[in-house]
């Protein structure tokens, strides 16, 4: 039976009455990516090797990817430095809040933001800012941790790595 609610990974991270809808399957995420005009995947440094292998597949499927923090070094080492953007997470958040931002390619802001691998408390603050100040963006946390400030989030799967990777694989299979 599906869980109605998930507890935030950081138990003090209770943002109020509106919390992320729990995602338990990958297909709805893939459908949202396909429907989005401009999806953006934000990748942070808290990523396992297996997660990185999946993120490389998002790059191959022409999803705009931005690496934050030291995550960019993994892409450079894998020969993908030219296909991935780099930004400081806090500055990127400020750009995303501006509906007139032109994006990394000059084509406009993004309507769907997916996040994985960010340090939990950094990602949580980014998602809180988007939730409260960027009505033009839908935010999904496809991370190993439940992020209540996202519109939708995977549950706490940090102890269930295989289950988490299967969800990422489901998304990729549908794209």
UniProtKB/Swiss-Prot annotation:
Which top-level group of life is the source organism from?
Archaea
- InterPro entries associated with the record: CdhB, DHS-like_NAD/FAD-binding_dom
TM segment ranges: none
Which GO terms of type biological process are on file?
methanogenesis, from acetate
Q: Known Pfam families for this protein?
A: CO_dh
Record-stated family: Belongs to the CdhB family.
What quaternary arrangement does the UniProt entry report?
A: Heterotetramer of two alpha and two epsilon subunits. The ACDS complex is made up of alpha, epsilon, beta, gamma and delta subunits with a probable stoichiometry of (alpha(2)epsilon(2))(4)-beta(8)-(gamma(1)delta(1))(8).
**Biological function:** Part of a complex that catalyzes the reversible cleavage of acetyl-CoA, allowing autotrophic growth from CO(2). The alpha-epsilon subcomponent functions as a carbon monoxide dehydrogenase. The precise role of the epsilon subunit is unclear; it may have a stabilizing role within the alpha(2)epsilon(2) component and/or be involved in electron transfer to FAD during a potential FAD-mediated CO oxidation.
Q: What is this protein called?
A: Acetyl-CoA decarbonylase/synthase complex subunit epsilon 2
Q: Which organism is it from?
A: Archaeoglobus fulgidus (strain ATCC 49558 / DSM 4304 / JCM 9628 / NBRC 100126 / VC-16)
- Phylogenetic classification of the source organism: Archaea, Methanobacteriati, Methanobacteriota, Archaeoglobi, Archaeoglobales
Q: Which gene encodes it?
A: cdhB2
